[in-house]
């Protein structure tokens, strides 16, 4: 296949008159449906992974299970640059997505196998019985000797499945977003903006279906059934994307932007050192702006080996990276939604819900995440159809960087609200505890309804509408055409760093020297820990970063305004 294959491109003007998606609805619909199913599978894994590993027969501690989930989510983002490179240099975006969905499906098979007793015994061996000590409950003499952290059962098989799924998710994540935008990019920035809105809407619809149905089945029916359903979702997503090949706009791989980027950076650094050694000879090369001369020396017109376009693309990337760096604390807080927020949920009073059987069912702790997703489903159409058009007509539509800053403010408020709630929960635990069984595990909860967590989830949902959507839009629109997959991969790469930072901080505060989360109690109880300190620490880090981000964003907007006249035609 040579060049770009674009079905139904005959009459662009007529299509534009009929609507920005005219002639592209089948392609966009296939992308959105595949993403919806993929997200349903992803949240089917992550929503109750802490509960799955925290319960019998695995009996991982709450902090251990939370760290595993944070590491998994970090991998799904850190692997994105590799997925972008694979698409750009070897396979093309469409084939890379198909391959990653196949790998995704292979990894998903591990979870129903771990949930089934016979296959679990084959993979992990027979369990060794251990005495569980309830160290968090009061003793008559006020003393209790807690055991050290127990070995994590089935850890190799669990992490193998998580790694395979993580690599599949990473490659899909890096490519499906720009691939979907490719279907409408010739229709202008308005089509791209609207696609990203509906793309994010599909992500959250998949999340709601997964959290509302799959999480309920996992907690109250069976983890085996609850993990078979997301496995089937990945299989259907693979078939949908395979069948959509006839209507997709596809492009062959045209070289890796990452390869060019590293070659240019290496050459520029070497030439800078050589130029500094010759600086006393009166050449005056580095008497100009060092930032420009550093990369301009790579151009053929300046005696370098690289074309003008490639050097300019790398210069554009270097200007974008500080924004991605500033988003790391945002993602660190964001990923608490499915880890420490869930751990907090399990230690609040969770109501029972009616069922058609005589078995008592409890409200899935993961359902709180739906407040975030439902809010996004409701507000994105409102934003797309009403708010944005009104702001645009009056010239008040904020830039993507300004929207990211607003999102940072709301996520800071979310972490702060979680810390306040945890402080109150610990006060109530000292007075009275409630024993509640969730997923086969007994938790000693505070007599405080789980609904008090709604504000922190709502605040994260509002932050997503501003920061996450604007971040995707910024990564795609600020990227040169030759580096769109690469920059999208870097966007997710720095998101993954945020998840790893959260895992690292959680491990750090679990050290006995700090003692915030160092209590090894009945596989997950946090009543003798100080989780609120962790939440307040996250809020403080994000608040300080917000101030720095405002400086970075203002500087970037000014630089963009200076160069926009010459490069706007290559950006969306």
Curated annotation (Swiss-Prot):
<dbReference type="GO" id="GO:0034165">
    <property type="term" value="P:positive regulation of toll-like receptor 9 signaling pathway"/>
</dbReference>
<dbReference type="GO" id="GO:0070434">
    <property type="term" value="P:positive regulation of nucleotide-binding oligomerization domain containing 2 signaling pathway"/>
</dbReference>
<feature type="transmembrane region" description="Helical">
    <location>
        <begin position="195"/>
        <end position="215"/>
    </location>
</feature>
<dbReference type="InterPro" id="IPR000109">
    <property type="entry name" value="POT_fam"/>
</dbReference>
<comment type="function">
    <text>Proton-coupled amino-acid transporter that mediates the transmembrane transport of L-histidine and some di- and tripeptides from inside the lysosome to the cytosol, and plays a key role in innate immune response. Able to transport a variety of di- and tripeptides, including carnosine and some peptidoglycans. Transporter activity is pH-dependent and maximized in the acidic lysosomal environment.</text>
</comment>
<dbReference type="GO" id="GO:0048302">
    <property type="term" value="P:regulation of isotype switching to IgG isotypes"/>
</dbReference>
<keyword id="KW-0967">Endosome</keyword>
<dbReference type="GO" id="GO:0045087">
    <property type="term" value="P:innate immune response"/>
</dbReference>
<keyword id="KW-0813">Transport</keyword>
<keyword id="KW-0571">Peptide transport</keyword>
<dbReference type="GO" id="GO:0015333">
    <property type="term" value="F:peptide:proton symporter activity"/>
</dbReference>
<keyword id="KW-0472">Membrane</keyword>
<feature type="transmembrane region" description="Helical">
    <location>
        <begin position="96"/>
        <end position="116"/>
    </location>
</feature>
<keyword id="KW-1133">Transmembrane helix</keyword>
<dbReference type="Pfam" id="PF00854">
    <property type="entry name" value="PTR2"/>
</dbReference>
<dbReference type="GO" id="GO:0033023">
    <property type="term" value="P:mast cell homeostasis"/>
</dbReference>
<dbReference type="GO" id="GO:0140206">
    <property type="term" value="P:dipeptide import across plasma membrane"/>
</dbReference>
<dbReference type="GO" id="GO:0036020">
    <property type="term" value="C:endolysosome membrane"/>
</dbReference>
<feature type="modified residue" description="Phosphoserine">
    <location>
        <position position="297"/>
    </location>
</feature>
<dbReference type="GO" id="GO:0015647">
    <property type="term" value="F:peptidoglycan transmembrane transporter activity"/>
</dbReference>
<feature type="transmembrane region" description="Helical">
    <location>
        <begin position="40"/>
        <end position="60"/>
    </location>
</feature>
<dbReference type="GO" id="GO:0089708">
    <property type="term" value="P:L-histidine transmembrane export from vacuole"/>
</dbReference>
<keyword id="KW-0812">Transmembrane</keyword>
<dbReference type="GO" id="GO:0070430">
    <property type="term" value="P:positive regulation of nucleotide-binding oligomerization domain containing 1 signaling pathway"/>
</dbReference>
<feature type="transmembrane region" description="Helical">
    <location>
        <begin position="223"/>
        <end position="243"/>
    </location>
</feature>
<dbReference type="GO" id="GO:0034161">
    <property type="term" value="P:positive regulation of toll-like receptor 8 signaling pathway"/>
</dbReference>
<dbReference type="GO" id="GO:0034157">
    <property type="term" value="P:positive regulation of toll-like receptor 7 signaling pathway"/>
</dbReference>
<dbReference type="InterPro" id="IPR018456">
    <property type="entry name" value="PTR2_symporter_CS"/>
</dbReference>
<feature type="transmembrane region" description="Helical">
    <location>
        <begin position="404"/>
        <end position="424"/>
    </location>
</feature>
<keyword id="KW-0399">Innate immunity</keyword>
<feature type="transmembrane region" description="Helical">
    <location>
        <begin position="534"/>
        <end position="554"/>
    </location>
</feature>
<keyword id="KW-0597">Phosphoprotein</keyword>
<dbReference type="GO" id="GO:0045089">
    <property type="term" value="P:positive regulation of innate immune response"/>
</dbReference>
<feature type="transmembrane region" description="Helical">
    <location>
        <begin position="67"/>
        <end position="87"/>
    </location>
</feature>
<feature type="transmembrane region" description="Helical">
    <location>
        <begin position="317"/>
        <end position="337"/>
    </location>
</feature>
<keyword id="KW-0391">Immunity</keyword>
<dbReference type="GO" id="GO:0005765">
    <property type="term" value="C:lysosomal membrane"/>
</dbReference>
<dbReference type="GO" id="GO:0016020">
    <property type="term" value="C:membrane"/>
</dbReference>
<dbReference type="GO" id="GO:0015835">
    <property type="term" value="P:peptidoglycan transport"/>
</dbReference>
<feature type="transmembrane region" description="Helical">
    <location>
        <begin position="362"/>
        <end position="382"/>
    </location>
</feature>
<comment type="subunit">
    <text>Interacts with TASL; leading to TASL recruitment to endolysosome.</text>
</comment>
<dbReference type="GO" id="GO:0070424">
    <property type="term" value="P:regulation of nucleotide-binding domain, leucine rich repeat containing receptor signaling pathway"/>
</dbReference>
């Amino acid at each position: 296949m040579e060049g770009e294959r674009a079905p139904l491109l005959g009459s662009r003007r007529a299509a534009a008159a009929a609507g920005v998606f005219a002639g592209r609805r089948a392609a966009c619909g296939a992308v959105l449906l595949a993403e919806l199913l993929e997200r349903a599978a992803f949240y089917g894994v992550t929503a109750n992974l802490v509960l799955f590993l925290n319960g019998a027969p695995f009996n991982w501690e709450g902090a251990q299970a939370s760290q595993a989930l944070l590491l998994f989510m970090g991998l799904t983002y850190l692997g994105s640059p590799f997925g972008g490179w694979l698409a750009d240099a070897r396979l093309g975006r469409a084939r890379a997505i198909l391959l990653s969905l196949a790998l995704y499906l292979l990894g998903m098979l591990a979870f129903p196998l771990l949930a089934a007793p016979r296959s679990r015994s084959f993979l992990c061996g027979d369990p060794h019985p251990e005495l569980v000590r309830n160290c968090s409950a009061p003793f008559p003499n006020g003393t209790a000797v807690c055991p050290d952290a127990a070995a994590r059962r089935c850890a190799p098989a669990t992490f193998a499945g998580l790694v395979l799924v993580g690599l599949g998710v990473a490659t899909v994540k890096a490519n499906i977003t720009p691939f979907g935008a490719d279907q409408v990019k010739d229709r202008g920035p308005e089509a791209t903006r609207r696609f990203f809105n509906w793309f994010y809407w599909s992500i959250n619809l998949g999340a709601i279906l997964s959290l509302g149905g799959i999480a309920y089945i996992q907690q109250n029916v069976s983890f085996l059934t609850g993990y078979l359903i997301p496995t089937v979702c990945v299989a259907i997503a693979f078939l949908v994307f395979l069948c959509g090949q006839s209507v997709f706009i596809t492009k062959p791989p045209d070289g890796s932007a990452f390869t060019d980027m590293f070659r240019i950076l290496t050459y520029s650094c070497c030439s800078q050192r050589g130029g500094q050694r010759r600086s006393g000879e009166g050449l005056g090369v580095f008497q100009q702006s060092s930032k420009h001369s550093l990369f301009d020396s790579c151009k053929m017109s300046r005696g370098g080996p690289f074309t003008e376009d490639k050097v300019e693309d790398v210069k554009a990337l270097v200007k974008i990276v500080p924004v991605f760096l500033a988003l790391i604390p945002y993602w660190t807080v964001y990923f608490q939604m499915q880890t420490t927020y869930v751990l907090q949920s399990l230690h609040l009073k969770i109501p029972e819900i009616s069922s058609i059987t005589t078995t008592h069912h409890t409200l899935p702790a993961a359902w709180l995440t739906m407040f975030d997703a439902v809010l996004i489903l409701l507000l994105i159409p409102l934003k797309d159809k009403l708010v944005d058009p009104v702001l645009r007509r009056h010239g008040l539509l904020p830039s993507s960087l300004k929207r990211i800053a607003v999102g940072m403010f709301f996520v800071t408020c979310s972490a702060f609200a979680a810390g306040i709630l945890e402080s109150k929960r610990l006060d109530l635990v000292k007075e009275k505890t409630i024993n509640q069984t969730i997923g086969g595990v007994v938790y000693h909860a505070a007599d405080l309804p789980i609904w008090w967590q709604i504000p922190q989830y709502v605040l994260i949902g509002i932050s997503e509408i501003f920061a996450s959507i604007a971040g995707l839009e910024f990564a795609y629109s600020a990227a040169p055409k030759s580096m769109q997959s690469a920059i999208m991969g870097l966007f997710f790469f720095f998101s993954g760093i945020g998840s790893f930072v959260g895992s690292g901080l959680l491990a750090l505060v679990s050290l006995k020297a700090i003692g915030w989360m160092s209590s090894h109690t009945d596989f997950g109880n946090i009543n003798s820990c100080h989780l609120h300190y962790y939440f307040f620490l996250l809020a403080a880090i994000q608040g300080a970063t917000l101030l720095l981000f405002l400086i970075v964003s203002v500087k970037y907007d000014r630089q963009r305004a200076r160069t926009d006249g010459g490069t706007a035609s290559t950006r969306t």
